[in-house]
C-alpha cells in the first residue's frame, strides 16, 4: 500500500513541477471533465463516506483496507494507467489541467483519510503536496479538516460501468497471459456474453476495454451474463 501510494505521488510530482502546476488556476467544473475523472472523483467521495463511517464505528482496520483498495485498484492501476498520456502531452490544455486537479485532489484526500492510521507517512506526503500549492494553510495533515463527502459527485451507475470495464479487461488480459500472447500484439475480436443491462453498460466503456486489452472489436453475445 505505501509503495503504491508513494509511486503514484512520484508519478504526479515530476510532471506537475515540469508544467508549473500549483493549483492556482480556477477549478475545471466536474461536469466538464472527462468521464474517467468523474468516475475517480465519484469513487473518492464514496471512499470518504465509507472511511468516515468506519472511523465512527472504531473500525480502523476496515478503513485501511478500503483506502488500500482505492489506491491500488482504482487510482494507481486504473486511473493513472489510463491517463498517463494526458500528463505526457505537450501544452497546458484544459484536459491536462483537469487531470492534474483530479489526481491532486485524490492524493491530498487519501493523505487526510489515512492520517489517523498512518500519521507520519500521511503527514510527509500531505506536506509535500501542499508545500507547492498552499491550498491548506496548515503545518500538518493532522491540523487539516477531515474530508467531507460530496454526495452530488457520487454516480453509482458510472462506478458500476467502470467496475465492469475493469473486470472484463482483467479477464481479457488473463486470457492473453494464459495463452502467451503479449499485450502489444493486437487481437481481432473479444466475445462477451451479456444480458441487456450488461450490454448497455459495457457499450459505454467499450473503447476503454479495447484499448486496455488491445483488441480491434468487441462482439456482445446475447445471453445470460455472470
Describe these PLM feature segments.
Residues 1-226:
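Feature 926 captures the class I aminoacyl-tRNA synthetase adenylation module centered on the KMSKS loop
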Amino acid at each position: 500500500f505505501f509503495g503504491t501510494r508513494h509511486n503514484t505521488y512520484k508519478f504526479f510530482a515530476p510532471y506537475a513541477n515540469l508544467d508549473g502546476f500549483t493549483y492556482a488556476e480556477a477549478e475545471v467544473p466536474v461536469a466538464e471533465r472527462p468521464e474517467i475523472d468523474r468516475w475517480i472523483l465519484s469513487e473518492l467521495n464514496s471512499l470518504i463516506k465509507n472511511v468516515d463511517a468506519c472511523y465512527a464505528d472504531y473500525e480502523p482496520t476496515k478503513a485501511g483496507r478500503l483506502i488500500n483498495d482505492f489506491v491500488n485498484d482504482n487510482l494507481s492501476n486504473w486511473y493513472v494507467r489510463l491517463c498517463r498520456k494526458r500528463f505526457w502531452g505537450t501544452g497546458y490544455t484544459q484536459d491536462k489541467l483537469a487531470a492534474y486537479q483530479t489526481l491532486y485532489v485524490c492524493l491530498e484526500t487519501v493523505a487526510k483519510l489515512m492520517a489517523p492510521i498512518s500519521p507520519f507517512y500521511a503527514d510527509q506526503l500531505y506536506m509535500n503536496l501542499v508545500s507547492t500549492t498552499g491550498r491548506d494553510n496548515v503545518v500538518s495533515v493532522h491540523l487539516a479538516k477531515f474530508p467531507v463527502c460530496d454526495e452530488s459527485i457520487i454516480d453509482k451507475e458510472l462506478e458500476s460501468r467502470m467496475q465492469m470495464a475493469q473486470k472484463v479487461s482483467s479477464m481479457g488480459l488473463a486470457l492473453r497471459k494464459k495463452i502467451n500472447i503479449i499485450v502489444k500484439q493486437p487481437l481481432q475480436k473479444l466475445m462477451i456474453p451479456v444480458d441487456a443491462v450488461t450490454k448497455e453498460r459495457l457499450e459505454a466503456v467499450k473503447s476503454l476495454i479495447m484499448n486496455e486489452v488491445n483488441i480491434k472489436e468487441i462482439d456482445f453475445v446475447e445471453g445470460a451474463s455472470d
